[in-house]
Amino acid sequence: RRIRDIREDNDLTQQQIAEILGTSQTMYARYERGANELPIRHLIRLAEYYRLSTDYLLGLTNEKKPYPSKKIKTR
């Protein structure tokens, strides 16, 4: 899975990322192996932390940049 490669490219341990996500290292390791589905809240947190698009994290695109945030118009 791509999340392992990104973590390793950033010289981070599974324990460090698990702490960022508020989960155990064991559970995070299961996400990396694909044994458990990565919850959406963790996907969003990883995208914010790494400043990458969720689609890139999921392997749906090779575009790393997050989508531009949309401005909410106020009346």
What are these regions (language model features)?
Residues 1-9:
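A short, Lys/Arg-rich alpha-helix, primarily the initiator
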Residues 7, 32, 55:
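Acidic active-site catalytic centers that drive phospho-/nucleotidyl reactions
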Residues 11-33, 45:
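Short alpha-helical DNA-recognition segment
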Residues 22, 39-56:
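DNA major-groove recognition helix of helix-turn-helix/homeodomain DNA-binding modules
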Residues 32, 50, 58-61:
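DNA major-groove recognition helix of helix-turn-helix
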Residues 58-75:
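Short, charged recognition helix plus adjacent turn
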